[in-house]
UniProtKB/Swiss-Prot annotation:
Residues 12-75 form the S5 DRBM domain. This is Small ribosomal subunit protein uS5. It comes from Buchnera aphidicola subsp. Acyrthosiphon pisum (strain APS) (Acyrthosiphon pisum symbiotic bacterium). The keyword Transit peptide does not apply. PROSITE patterns: RIBOSOMAL_S5, S5_DSRBD.
Amino acid sequence: MANIEKKNHNDLQEKLITVNRVSKTVKGGRIFSFTALTVVGNGDGKVGFGYGKAREVPAAIQKAMEQARRNMITIPLVNKTLQHSLKGSHTGSNVFMKPASDGTGIIAGGAMRAVLEVAGIHNVLAKTYGSTNPINVVRATMNGLVNMKSPEMIAAKRNKRIKDILG
């Protein structure tokens, strides 16, 4: 059920990663509800994810999209790829992402691919280790992207010039 829906809203790309039917067992039977996992990005370094729950599918998707728009982060990109190799983890999922040269494309699987596409990353090599649960993979990917540092940030932290950092 990966990447079912893609549309634009205020220059944001929205992707639906997964919709899941869950049930609660009560005395009279089962109560079904739905969960939706979505990612939103502007294609230029801003990305966010949302997880919505509701009794109907459209309501769950709408809640997830709104949450994704509220929880957006900015990541520093260079030439539509990552600044450096990075790792991210969340519960049982571990992800490894590595910058790639022009023309490589997004080499990543499932939920991680959707996050990287809407973030505006065009060339990257990525691998998921451990659990491939879409929610955990998206959270691990976001954790990795949050920890990415640009040369400007490193130079400011070390009180050095950028050219000293880059060599």
